[in-house]
Regions:
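Beta-propeller blade termini
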Residues: 40-50, 91-101, 106, 151-161, ...
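Short, solvent-exposed loop/turn segments at conserved positions within beta-propeller repeat blades
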Residues: 62-63, 116-121, 170-174, 220-223, ...
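Bacterial N-terminal signal peptides
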Residues: 9-19
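Gly/Ser/Thr/Pro-enriched helix-cap/hinge segments flanking short amphipathic alpha-helices
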Residues: 30-34, 286, 334-476
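Beta-strand-rich domains and repeat architectures in extracellular enzymes and scaffolds
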Residues: 31-63
Length: 476
């Protein structure tokens, strides 16, 4: 009888998945040192205090904007200056990039005190001078073209591939803006660049989408999406030609992702209460390959594509508001498989923004989620539970001025894949990820090389000798 039961137990061990009750994420929210309930929106990742380390920026809607830096095992707010913290202007969108070509990123805070149309307070463009944060829009010469229209997301665009970034502002109920330095003055160039359309602007991404220049995809509400092809620094909307207008849907979270691991970027696009899209370029037309359960409608906010568990396959995190979050893994041949969630499910969470970064430099990404809108909640922070033998490679491209080369494309080439990632210029929805290409390494992967396509379309290849490191590469 004892032998009989032993056989049954052995059989059950074989047939029951060992990871049946395993959590993908672990909750590390406790490392946030001061984490009260608040109304938060967009999240970005940049080096706020120019100390060489990346920090999370969390916007506040009637609450302080935060700069969370990892110090002594804790995430601590390191900025309490009025121009940055700015609790009265109701910030929702944020992105960082180097507009003045000094090698450090300025921070664009998009403020919105009304749902649509004309707003009371303009946006801020924050620059660190010495130890003081200043708003470049408060300088008299820069006040000609202030944005006084309600908006949502912002994205950084190096339209000429010369390291001179501009900021695309997705406005709601008013024309799109595109801010850039011209003769040492910040001006709106949206009209001359063919970008000044009026729509319900929501999410926006920029990168090597359909050309070797930096193109723009904008997911809109109550109107068609835009797909701007960059031709000699000006833009032509080709959304209809490429079949991504999606006029019956209301766009939200958007990210660039190499869905087929073929060495090019495609588009993940979530729609509010509508079908989510996985647009893959085939024969000069984007085909939506999304299937259930990935495409099932939800109250989507942020979409993030990243390798959380360092297995060499990207996950897709869907941050929903007022309903549970979802997680998927992109397998070979465009198969998108759902991963059960318990930790980070947040079925009662009012998620409004999210971003990823390896904030503690241990080779595993952290996921920071902000909450708010109709219900004040604290921030939450998660990271994947991973096997100790998993390896990673992180690639940090810097442009010729020494700033993050946002919009550049990094491709890992090996015996198993050709896997592209964008150096994030702004994505998700209201948000922006760390400007590093983070790769987990697959089992039996070898002969690894890295290719960088800079924002000017030129490419360079590099051999990789050692893993478990961050490689910093400066543009020549």
């Amino acid at each position: 009888m004892t032998k009989y039961f032993k056989k049954i137990i052995f059989f059950l061990i074989l047939i029951i998945p060992t990871n049946l009750n395993a959590s993908f994420f672990k909750d590390v929210t406790s490392i946030i040192s001061d984490n009260p309930k608040r109304l938060s929106y967009g999240v970005s990742v940049t080096d706020v205090n120019q100390d060489g380390n990346f920090d999370f920026i969390v916007t506040g809607f009637g609450y302080l904007n935060l700069a969370l830096s990892y110090e002594n095992g804790k995430l601590i707010n390191i900025v309490n200056q009025e121009k940055f913290s700015d609790e009265f202007r109701r910030t929702i969108g944020v992105a960082a990039c180097d507009l003045d070509r000094d090698g450090y990123e300025e921070i664009y805070f998009l403020n919105t005190d009304t749902y649509s149309g004309t707003k009371k307070y303009s946006d801020r463009l924050i620059d660190l001078k010495g130890e003081k944060f200043i708003d470049l829009f408060e300088i008299k010469k820069n006040q000609k073209d202030l944005n006084l229209t309600a908006g949502r997301s912002v994205v950084c665009v190096d339209r000429n591939g010369d390291g001179k970034y501009g900021v695309y502002v997705a406005n709601y109920g008013g024309p799109t803006r595109f801010y850039e330095y011209s003769d040492d003055v910040i001006v709106d160039k949206s009209v001359q660049l063919n970008l000044a359309k009026i729509t319900g602007g929501r999410a926006v991404v920029a990168g090597h989408i359909i050309s070797n220049n930096i193109d723009i995809f904008a997911a809109n509400e109550r109107g068609p999406n835009f797909l701007y092809k960059n031709k000699d620094g000006k833009f032509l909307d080709v959304a209809n030609e490429y079949r991504v207008e999606d006029v019956l849907q209301n766009g939200r979270g958007t990210a660039l992702s190499d869905i087929y691991y073929r060495g090019r970027l495609d588009i993940l696009n979530g729609n509010w209460g509508g079908f989510h899209r996985a647009y893959v370029l085939k024969n000069k037309i984007f085909e939506d390959i999304a299937k259930p359960p990935f495409d099932e409608p939800s109250r989507i906010r942020t979409i993030i594509s990243a390798d959380f568990d360092n297995d060499g396959f990207d996950e897709i995190f869907m941050n929903n508001i007022g309903e549970q979050n979802k997680l998927f893994k992109i397998l070979e041949n465009g198969v998108i498989e759902q991963i059960p969630l318990d930790i980070a499910l947040e079925k009662n969470g009012y998620g409004t923004g999210a971003a990823v970064a390896d904030i503690d430099n241990d080779g595993v990404l952290e996921l920071l989620i902000s909450h708010g809108e109709s219900f004040d909640q604290p921030l939450s922070l998660y990271k994947a539970k991973i096997a100790s033998n998993r390896k990673y490679l992180r690639v940090k491209p810097l442009n010729k001025y020494g700033a993050p080369a946002r919009g550049a494309t990094v491709t890992l080439i090996s015996n198993l894949r050709k896997h592209s990632k964008t150096i994030d210029a702004g994505s998700g929805y209201l948000c922006q990820m760390e400007p590093i290409a983070h790769y987990g390494i697959r089992e039996k992967e070898k002969n690894i090389k890295i290719q960088i396509k800079w924002t000017n379309g030129k490419t360079e290849k590099y051999s990789v000798r050692d893993l478990n490191q961050t490689i910093t590469i400066k543009q020549k």
